[in-house]
A protein has these predicted regions:
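Alpha-helical transmembrane segments of multi-pass small-molecule/ion transporters
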Residues: 1-310
Length: 310
């Protein structure tokens, strides 16, 4: 199991490194990257999930057990983090960044790894993960921003933030098409599939371009706390929930990978918009993206000795 994970992680790491190099050298100007990330987030990745779920055999996927394990572990770790809030030496805005670093995940890295490990089946499982976790994480993060951030949100803004998420919309469209037994028109499906295929390389390049290592050194204590929850507490909670709900090897592997992913670069944007600590968020994102290259294989290696993987 670990060998295939490392093989799947290698091209992901190379694309992230290439994106960072392209930005640092100025080969591609800074003005390009926000537009590229917006394209990935609002068009390419939703197309990938809509196409994957519309063509997946949902009856062959453990949709409800997988969703229950992911939502349960996410809520559990969120509550645990709130309980230790008093021991985290940051202000309220800083705590929102620690919270995001512990529970949010990078869709591009997760989807690329799932595709590398299990092909089309992995993309379908990844789409189920996104459909389950994205609304849960957005709800938890927005509630934490409302409580600890510098900007207050109303109830309608909270609902709109969740329902308008393009990844949720893409997953909902794919599931609706699957349930209704309809498909994209023959002239449209190749275009949708091509858009989805473009999401992974461009998204990973954007991840690398967004890395800022200077800020990671300034906030080591909160960065380490967020990363400990991300790479240790979250996978352990997911393993326990996965075993409780009887997930098979492939579904549990994808669940663990998604819950051990580094936090997303969109966390920085959310921190700026909702009154969080944006510099701290940038540091956590940079640290976790690099640490994930070691942490994710280590997590799977440690868990590979459990009976679930035998």
């Amino acid at each position: 199991m670990i060998g295939p994970i490392l093989l799947a992680l290698a091209p992901v790491a190379l694309l992230v490194a290439l994106g960072h190099g392209l930005r640092r050298t100025g080969f591609i100007g800074d003005a390009f990257w926000p537009h590229a990330e917006r394209l990935c987030y609002y068009v390419l990745l939703p197309a990938l999930f809509a196409d994957g779920l519309a063509n997946a055999r949902l009856q062959a996927l453990p949709v409800l057990p997988l969703a229950a394990a992911l939502v349960g572990s996410t809520v559990f770790v969120s509550m645990l983090l709130l309980l230790v809030r008093r021991f985290v030496a940051v202000d309220g805005a800083g705590f929102t960044s620690v919270f995001q670093g512990a529970v949010r995940f990078n869709n591009y890295v997760g989807t690329a790894l799932a595709a590398g490990l299990f092909g089309a089946h992995g993309i379908a499982l990844a789409a189920v993960c996104v459909a389950a976790i994205v609304p849960t994480v957005n709800l938890m993060c927005v509630l934490v921003f409302a409580r600890y951030g510098d900007t207050r949100l109303g109830a309608w803004a909270l609902v709109r933030q969740i329902l308008s998420n393009p990844l949720v919309v893409g997953c909902a469209l794919g599931i609706a098409m699957q349930v209704a037994g309809i498909a994209f028109p023959a002239a449209v499906e190749p275009a949708v599939r091509a858009l989805g295929a473009a999401s992974m390389p461009l998204g990973l390049l954007c991840v690398g371009a967004a890395l800022k290592f200077d800020s990671a050194r300034e906030w080591m204590q909160p960065t380490c706390i967020a990363s400990a929850f991300k790479f240790m507490a979250m996978p352990l909670a997911t393993l326990a929930a996965g075993r409780l709900f009887g997930l098979g090897d492939a579904a549990l592997t994808i669940a663990l990978l998604f819950q051990a992913l580094p936090t997303s670069s969109s966390s920085y944007i959310m921190a700026r918009q909702l009154g969080g600590d944006a510099p701290l968020m940038a540091g956590i994102t940079a640290f976790q993206t690099i640490a994930a290259a070691l942490a994710m294989p280590a997590v799977l290696t440690a868990l590979a000795s459990t009976p679930v993987f035998r």
